[in-house]
């Protein structure tokens, strides 16, 4: 994959909006997972911390940690795209993410569900600061992170006996 053009403005939009969301992580983590389940109710079984419950648990530390990882890694990806023109996640981290997502049975459409939930959460959290430019910047960063994870998942699949 060649270099990706990610502008300073796109990077700034992602960083600034992440700073706003970080101010209420519990609320936006809950909103994020609620959106995932609203879009794709069957996704519940893919998350160990949601399997045995009928609703998104309010004070589940694993839920919060997972949501924060998605937002943080997307934000870090935006910075890398701007600085290096590509996604540079530590090989071990990317391998781990590929392995975990592969073993959990994650498929391409699942990444789109997460992206839609991410966009809805941004819209909710940013209010009037949300616009198409913000959505575009986050979407581009997320898409490239998802591509990197999917590449590792294919690697994991090809190593199966």
Swiss-Prot record:
Record EC number: 1.7.2.-
Domain (Globin): residue spans on this chain: 5-154
Sequence motif Homodimerization, location on chain: 38-42, 108-120
Keywords: Cytoplasm, Heme, Iron, Metal-binding, Nucleus, Oxidoreductase
Matches recorded under Pfam families: Globin
Family note: Belongs to the plant globin family.
Task performed by this protein: Phytoglobin that reduces nitrite to nitric oxide (NO) under anoxic conditions (e.g. during flooding or in waterlogged soil). May not function as an oxygen storage or transport protein. Has an unusually high affinity for O(2) through an hexacoordinate heme iron because of a very low dissociation constant.
PANTHER family according to UniProt: LEGHEMOGLOBIN-RELATED (PTHR22924), NON-SYMBIOTIC HEMOGLOBIN 2 (PTHR22924:SF92)
Protein name listed in UniProt: Anaerobic nitrite reductase HB2
């Amino acid at each position: 994959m060649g270099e990706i053009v990610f502008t300073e403005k796109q990077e700034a939009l992602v960083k600034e909006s992440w700073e706003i969301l970080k101010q209420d992580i519990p609320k936006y983590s809950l909103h994020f997972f609620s959106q995932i389940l609203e879009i794709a109710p069957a996704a519940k079984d893919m998350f160990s911390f949601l399997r045995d419950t009928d609703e998104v648990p309010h004070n589940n530390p694993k839920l919060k940690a997972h949501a924060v990882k998605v937002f943080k890694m997307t934000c870090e990806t935006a910075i890398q795209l701007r600085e290096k023109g590509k996604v540079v996640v530590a090989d071990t981290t990317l391998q781990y993410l590929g392995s975990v997502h592969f073993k959990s049975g994650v498929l391409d459409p699942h990444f789109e569900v997460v992206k839609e939930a991410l966009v809805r959460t941004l819209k909710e959290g940013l209010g009037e600061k949300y616009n198409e430019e913000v959505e575009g910047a986050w979407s581009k960063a997320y898409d490239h992170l998802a591509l990197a994870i999917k590449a590792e998942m294919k690697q994991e699949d090809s190593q199966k006996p």
